[in-house]
Amino acid sequence: MRTRAAVALAPGKPLQVMDVNLEDPREGEVLIEIKATGICHTDEFTLSGADPEGLFPAILGHEGAGVVVKCGPGVKSLKPGDHVIPLYTPECRECPSCLSQKTNLCTAIRATQGQGLMPDGTTRFSMLDGTPIFHYMGCSTFANHTVMPEIALAKVRDDAPFDKICYIGCGVTTGIGAVLNTAKVEIGAKAVVFGLGGIGLNVIQGLKMAGADMIIGVDINDDKKEWGEKFGMTHFVNPKSLPEGTSVVQAIVDMTKTPFDKIGGADYSFDCTGNVKVMRDALECTHRGWGQSIIIGVAPAGATIETRPFQLVTGRVWKGTAFGGARGRTDVPKIVDWYMDGKIEIDSMITHILPLDRINEGFDLMHEGKSIRSVVVF
């Protein structure tokens, strides 16, 4: 069949909207009509050419929602008409990682997914002249139709709006999940969030759900203060506005001191920036003896993090998280329910709705800092 897609032909170049060929689903695969897709910083990272694993030509996009059109042989959990959210972190429920219950990082299709291919080592997309087009993160939601493995699709309720729940495919789950699944924040905790973009706001939302008492947002853009407060932030710090000689670490330690606890420091911190210097600050502002710092942001290729070993010897912990520690097929439907039940907010984060032909405007809005999340609808 033919479908419409925004194709990344080369790094650093705008996406080109065109008709492409799409083959039918094979064994264990599903054809999806994508109804809406978010534009994420990860898509931008690859499109820019900074991603060492970036492949071209490719159909990017990994934050979508749509409807099952056709199932290949052997598919048991889905049928035509089902509403689904694509998962860049699948859940096969059979590999050692899934069975361990210690991680959400399913390894069933990781090797081929990283090569921009389907599990059988081939691609379903091609140019009209037959040139193969790579898949992206196993999803390729910048196409009106895509083919994905059954294990990488979460079935969700039919009454949830596609242009909102697509955000659950990455940003919402990554932020909220980092709080609830990875850090396991408890009622009354003091927490700090570095970087108040889409992920950071969802971390704040997760902290509010968890019952954190003190939620400190850190950003160099004062405009983010209003956004943070909307989702539950209680305090705001702009490192550029601190008195001369006062570091952001010292400011946070001082803010979290009490008459009972004169040491100070956050119980939890979350880095949503991908900046390795900020990651160090995020660790070192946590409390001696038990502070946990969760790394969410993706750093540039080759970047390394550092701190004095004494910071770790004295009880602080560095943790990483991917997709918020969520097991996609199990957890994503629950998060959709939370949204539909009014337990989490998504609507106000979708700041721009665009047709596919204007997808490059969504990237421009991201670069200019004018959007939280732009969504393309088909």
Where are these regions (language model features)?
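Adenosine-nucleotide cofactor-binding segment
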Residues: 193-196, 208-281, 302
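Helix-to-beta-strand junctions that scaffold the AdoMet/dcAdoMet cofactor pocket
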Residues: 286-288
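NAD(P)H dinucleotide-binding glycine-rich loop of Rossmann-like/cofactor-binding domains
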Residues: 94-194, 242
